């Protein structure tokens, strides 16, 4: 691809993402499906703006690579050891059972047994990028089904190595393609990467961090991710697996959070590029020619994988309410199928249109997953948002709620407990199904689902409630919910959680004045206690705390129209001087000994 063509392709990708994703989100079909539809639109079978799909698809795998690096950072070797049974138990069983069933079905459709084995293995894999993205959107990351889903995906990445090695054996060209000396060298190189990463990465990053130049740290992070990906690719292994290992090796380092911050912007853009590329690869010509075959293939593929995954989840002891989430989120074909089928095609294992039909099936199965997860959400909503069962009568009054609490993590739980202790009627909205199960056992009136859906808010009693408390983890969800409440339920008093000053500014701009910055009050209280330990009188420390809170809120309001860092820094310095002057004036006015305050808790 020429330089100008590459730049044009980049502009087209950005335009497609900017145009399609907000529209898809507004239609309620999710960002992933929006990316896929955008890819179809600009690809060779749509408007035809881009024709070199294979090269872009290979480049776009970097999105998966960055995602796996961040996932590795969130784990550590001890956590992986705890997951060993689910990885090598459920993960292995899923691949083997799905591959066997799908291979048998392919043989019934006139695939040779060798092609059927390769096809079954490729179709048994799921899309790491799509599954992890949907698990995050659905709040599954911390749940039992989310942990099990991650274990299955990790085993699938590990299975890439033997699957690729199996292709030339099935093609009957093992002697021609297998050089056992080269394989031994690759194994040694892989072991060398593990040992070198274990003992060299932290000293190297310590040296780079000592320079104090943030750009160099970001460059070093990119070098690590791309370098480990290329190294694994040169060995014929999964690039995503290489960066995952690099992330795990750094998971316990002091640079973990800085690494996540440096990588996150690249991960999001490249993941979007990956989904657009998958959409571009959809061969609409094959779809038109073999429409019935493709539709049946997609339905059978998704049904077989759901059956296997649901069965394994049940055997593993996953709660019944989480099994469908687990099965649905992994029901699609995966990006690894493109690699495996290309390798098999080069070995002439497939005949005629077999490879094209398989690739179309995989691509369309990816497009079914966001829609399938919406159906699962609706099913769970009907199951958990209907009338309580007789054996699960909560002590919460069944009257219309006074307060709706959105999100019931650690922040929301404190609020909910305080309200219930004062006999307030509350309803909780939560999208983590495992949390819903737990809260119902403790007697909370809780609805499952996405609180940004107007129908869910209405069924939860938003039209009769007096207030809504928003404690979402994601600032984007908070702002979207604020907009919905202001539009559809203007009578509600909106109270919200702000992660920091940026979110506080956004809430103020949206007209929300009742909010709490999650670390501000606790930090201010600890600061007051510090003043007391340094000799300040408890009453004076309390006054200082109140003055600081008042001044900080005033400064927060004044900074709303000021968007540049320079202006904000200048105003912050001015506010600090103003705070010091206030304290000095108070000290001059209070010349008396404050004996009434000996201790303040």
Curated annotation (Swiss-Prot):
Q: Transmembrane residues, as ranges?
A: 4-24, 29-49, 55-75, 87-107, 115-135, 152-172, 177-197, 207-227, 230-250, 268-288, 291-311, 324-344, 356-376
On whether Transmembrane helix is a keyword of this UniProt record, the answer is yes
Name the HAMAP family on file.
K_H_efflux_KefB
Q: PANTHER family per the record?
A: K(+) EFFLUX ANTIPORTER 3, CHLOROPLASTIC (PTHR46157:SF4)
Give the family from UniProt.
Belongs to the monovalent cation:proton antiporter 2 (CPA2) transporter (TC 2.A.37) family. KefB subfamily.
Q: What does this protein do?
A: Pore-forming subunit of a potassium efflux system that confers protection against electrophiles. Catalyzes K(+)/H(+) antiport.
What is the protein's given name?
Answer: Glutathione-regulated potassium-efflux system protein KefB
Per the UniProt record, the source organism is Escherichia coli O127:H6 (strain E2348/69 / EPEC)
Lineage in the entry? Answer: Bacteria, Pseudomonadati, Pseudomonadota, Gammaproteobacteria, Enterobacterales
């Amino acid at each position: 691809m020429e330089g100008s063509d590459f730049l044009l392709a980049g502009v087209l990708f950005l335009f497609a993402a900017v145009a399609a994703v907000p529209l898809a989100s507004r239609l309620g079909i999710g960002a992933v499906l929006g990316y896929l539809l955008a890819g179809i639109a600009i690809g060779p079978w749509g408007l035809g703006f881009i024709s070199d799909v294979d090269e872009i698809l290979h480049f776009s795998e970097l999105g998966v690579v960055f995602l796996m690096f961040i996932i590795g950072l969130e784990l550590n070797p001890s956590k992986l050891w705890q997951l060993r049974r689910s990885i090598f138990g459920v993960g292995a069983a899923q691949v083997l059972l799905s591959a066997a069933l799908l291979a048998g079905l392919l043989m019934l459709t006139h695939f040779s047994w060798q092609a059927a084995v390769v096809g079954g293995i490729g179709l048994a894999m799921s899309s790491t990028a799509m599954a992890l993205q949907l698990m995050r959107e659905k709040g599954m990351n911390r749940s039992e089904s989310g942990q099990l889903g991650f274990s299955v995906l990790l085993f699938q990445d590990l299975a890439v190595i033997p699957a690729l090695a199996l292709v030339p054996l099935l093609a009957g060209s093992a002697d021609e393609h297998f050089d056992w000396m080269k394989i031994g060298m690759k194994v040694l190189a892989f072991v060398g990467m593990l040992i070198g990463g274990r003992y060299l990465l932290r000293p190297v990053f310590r040296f780079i961090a000592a320079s104090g130049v943030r750009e160099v740290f970001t460059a070093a992070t990119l070098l690590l991710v791309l370098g480990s990906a290329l190294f694994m690719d040169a060995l014929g292994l999964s690039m995503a697996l290489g960066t995952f290992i690099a992330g795990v090796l750094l998971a316990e380092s002091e640079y973990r959070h800085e690494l996540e911050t440096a990588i996150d912007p690249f991960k999001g853009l490249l993941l979007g590029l990956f989904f657009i590329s998958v959409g571009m690869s959809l061969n609409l010509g094959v779809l038109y020619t073999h429409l019935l075959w493709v539709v049946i293939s997609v339905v059978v593929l998704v049904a077989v994988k759901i059956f296997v995954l649901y069965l394994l989840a049940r055997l593993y002891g996953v709660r019944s309410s989480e099994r469908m989430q687990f099965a649905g989120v992994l029901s699609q074909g995966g990006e690894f199928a493109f690699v495996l089928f290309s390798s098999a095609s080069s070995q002439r294992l497939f005949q005629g249109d077999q490879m094209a039909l398989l690739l179309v099936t995989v691509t369309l199965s990816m497009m079914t997953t966001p829609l399938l997860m919406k159906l699962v959400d609706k099913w769970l909503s009907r199951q958990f948002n209907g009338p309580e069962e007789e054996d699960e009568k909560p002590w919460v009054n069944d009257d219309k709620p006074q307060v709706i609490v959105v999100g019931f993590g650690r922040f929301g739980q404190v609020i909910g407990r305080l309200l219930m202790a004062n006999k307030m009627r509350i309803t909780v909205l939560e999208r983590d199904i495992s949390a819903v199960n737990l809260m119902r056992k403790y007697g909370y009136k809780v609805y499952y689902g996405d609180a940004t859906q107007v129908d869910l808010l209405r069924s939860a009693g938003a039209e009769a409630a007096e207030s809504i408390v928003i404690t979402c983890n994601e600032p984007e969800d908070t702002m979207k919910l604020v907009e919905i409440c202001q539009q559809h339920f203007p009578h509600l008093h909106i109270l919200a959680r702000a992660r920091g000053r940026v979110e506080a500014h956004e809430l103020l701009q949206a007209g929300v004045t009742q909010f709490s910055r999650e670390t501000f009050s606790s930090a201010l209280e600890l600061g007051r206690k510090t003043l007391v330990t340094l000799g300040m009188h408890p009453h004076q420390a309390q006054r200082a705390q109140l003055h600081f809170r008042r001044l900080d809120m005033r400064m927060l309001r004044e900074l709303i129209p000021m968007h540049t860092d320079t202006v904000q820094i200048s105003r912050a310095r001015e506010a600090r001087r103003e705070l010091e002057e206030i304290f000095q004036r108070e000290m001059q006015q209070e010349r008396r000994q404050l004996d009434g305050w000996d201790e303040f808790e």
